[in-house]
């Protein structure tokens, strides 16, 4: 779950409203589209699926959002803006890097299994397969969204080095990738039905190796 989504290219820009005022709630329609994309993915979601979920006709969809691609890009941003706080709030306020990583993963265990709100399981960004079927710009948008997790982790671990909590010899790049991979794996397991308790146990096992990975050996 992220909240930084760069926009690139024409497909990332929603159409500007023109003509008669809309006869539907655009925000509510976007929320419905986001949920549908989250559950089914971009490729498996058809325009008819979207119009049914959003309660509008296809002309209204195109007038309000421009295209399916532009709607998906906006849905990704909406997803991040609405849901990122579930996993990042405690991370950002944690006093130590260890506490930050633990909070990120534990809060992910709750959020990814729908335990903090009535949300679909898994992470919309992690589970997205868009980009390999002729939608290069959307693929780049998704990759950039995924990169946010790594960048935040690497920055926080770097601060841990500055604070003396993590050894200067520690490979914080590799450690950030490791934590990112753990969280991504949790998303897949959550989508497959793993419980919050199972994911929390996974986090505890992950953190058992913290000292080995962050301190000088010998």
Predicted regions and their residues:
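Amphipathic C-terminal alpha-helical segment
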Residues: 111-115, 131-134, 159, 179-197, ...
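Helix-turn-helix
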Residues: 28, 36-74
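Hydrophobic alpha-helical connector segments
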Residues: 74, 88-121, 172-179
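Hydrophobic alpha-helical segments that form the core
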Residues: 2-5, 107, 121-127, 168-189, ...
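Short, basic, alpha-helical segments at the C-terminal edge of helix-turn-helix-like DNA-binding modules
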Residues: 77-82
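Short hydrophobic clusters on alpha-helical segments that form packing/core surfaces
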Residues: 29-37, 108, 183
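N-terminal intrinsically disordered/low-complexity leader segments
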Residues: 1-24, 214-218
């Amino acid at each position: 779950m992220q909240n930084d989504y760069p926009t690139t290219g024409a497909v990332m820009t929603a159409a500007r409203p023109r003509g008669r005022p809309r006869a539907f709630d655009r925000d509510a329609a976007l929320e419905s589209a986001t949920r549908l994309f989250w559950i089914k993915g971009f490729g498996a979601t058809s325009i008819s699926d979207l119009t049914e979920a959003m309660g509008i006709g296809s002309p209204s969809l195109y007038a309000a959002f421009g295209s399916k691609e532009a709607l998906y890009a906006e849905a990704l941003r909406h997803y991040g803006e609405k849901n990122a706080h579930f996993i990042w709030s405690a991370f950002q306020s944690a006093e130590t890097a260890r506490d930050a990583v633990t909070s990120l993963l534990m809060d992910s265990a709750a959020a990814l299994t729908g335990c903090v709100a009535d949300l679909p399981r898994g992470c919309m960004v992690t589970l997205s397969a868009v980009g390999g079927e002729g939608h290069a710009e959307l693929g780049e948008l998704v990759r950039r969204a995924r990169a946010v997790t790594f960048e935040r982790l690497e920055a926080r671990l770097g601060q841990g080095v500055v604070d003396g909590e993590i050894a200067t010899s520690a490979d914080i790049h590799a450690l950030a990738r490791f934590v990112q991979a753990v969280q991504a794996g949790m998303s897949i397991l959550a989508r497959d039905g793993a419980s919050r308790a199972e994911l929390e146990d996974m986090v505890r096992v992950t953190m058992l190796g913290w000292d080995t990975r962050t301190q000088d050996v010998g």
